[in-house]
Amino acid sequence: MGLIIKGKPVADAISETLIKEVDNFKIQGIIPKLVIIRVGAKASDLAYEKGILKRCNGIGIETYVKEFPEDISQREFIRELRRLNEDRNVDGIMVFRPLPKHLDENIIKYVITPEKDIDCFNPINLAKVIAGDSTGFAPCTPRAVMEILKYYNIDVEGKFSVVIGRSMIVGKPMSMLLLNENSTVTTCHSKTVHLDKICSQADILVAGIGKAEFIDSKYIKEGAVVIDVGINVDKYGKLCGDVDIKSCQWKNVIVTPVPGGVGTVTSSVLAQHVVEACKHKNKL
């Protein structure tokens, strides 16, 4: 019988620690501040924003949203981003991506200052992830995966890990974080041949393929740990992940659900990054 491990206990544990830290900051007259930059009003962005606001406000982090119209020019967007870079009261900046096509992310990602880039938009932070430099900010979703593994005492050292997906937001940094913890990592993608055979050898499988319930029992070996980072909608219109949990319920596996898994932890990790940025700025 499979074991489902949920994200809420992980998120709550992170938040509990952060609340104590922020309370200590306030005694010194310091209040961490996050600014969310959102262009337009996509449903997925609004849902994520709601979760961030709830989590950060509960911790004691001042959180503000800067909403821009979808037709904002690149020049104006960059000007606003630079203002936030220069604002000493702002500790963290979160840019919701992807941006509209007329806003060139390959240019904008170099504008955000790395010290405030709490979701690894600037390549400098990605380079730090690759180098195993803890002073950089990893993307929140891969970091949330690592927090889940840590909370449930799942050791990755020496294990064979397979990451499905090679995006800059999840797949590539996820592979690096696992590698930094001495896991042996294989990264798979849409062109990978014999995907099921590779996945079925994994001790730890991180699924970020972006296909609803695509990963079934033939991709998962007995005793594997399966972390589902997919967010999809099934044929009934319900939120689901990349893993078909029902198909592997009779296997001896550990799996995270969707919803209620990695996504639950992501907003707490983001808050953690804001607090870390605040500590760095104030030399705490």
Swiss-Prot record:
A Pfam cross-reference name: THF_DHG_CYH_C
Gene: folD
Pathway named in the protein's UniProt entry: One-carbon metabolism; tetrahydrofolate interconversion
Protein's UniProt keywords contain Cell wall biogenesis/degradation: no
GO BP field: L-histidine biosynthetic process; methionine biosynthetic process; purine nucleotide biosynthetic process; tetrahydrofolate interconversion
Catalytic activity field: (6R)-5,10-methylene-5,6,7,8-tetrahydrofolate + NADP(+) = (6R)-5,10-methenyltetrahydrofolate + NADPH; (6R)-5,10-methenyltetrahydrofolate + H2O = (6R)-10-formyltetrahydrofolate + H(+)
UniProt organism field: Clostridium kluyveri (strain ATCC 8527 / DSM 555 / NBRC 12016 / NCIMB 10680 / K1)
Keywords, ordered alphabetically: Amino-acid biosynthesis, Histidine biosynthesis, Hydrolase, Methionine biosynthesis, Multifunctional enzyme, NADP, One-carbon metabolism, Oxidoreductase, Purine biosynthesis
Entry GO MF terms: methenyltetrahydrofolate cyclohydrolase activity; methylenetetrahydrofolate dehydrogenase (NADP+) activity
CDD domains listed in its UniProt record: NAD_bind_m-THF_DH_Cyclohyd
GO cellular component: cytosol
Functional summary from the UniProt entry: Catalyzes the oxidation of 5,10-methylenetetrahydrofolate to 5,10-methenyltetrahydrofolate and then the hydrolysis of 5,10-methenyltetrahydrofolate to 10-formyltetrahydrofolate.
InterPro entries cross-referenced by the UniProt entry: Aminoacid_DH-like_N_sf, NAD(P)-bd_dom_sf, THF_DH/CycHdrlase, THF_DH/CycHdrlase_cat_dom, THF_DH/CycHdrlase_NAD-bd_dom
Descriptive protein name: Bifunctional protein FolD
EC id: 1.5.1.5, 3.5.4.9
UniProt record similarity statement: Belongs to the tetrahydrofolate dehydrogenase/cyclohydrolase family.
Binding site for NADP(+): G165, R166, S167, S190, I231
Quaternary assembly: Homodimer.
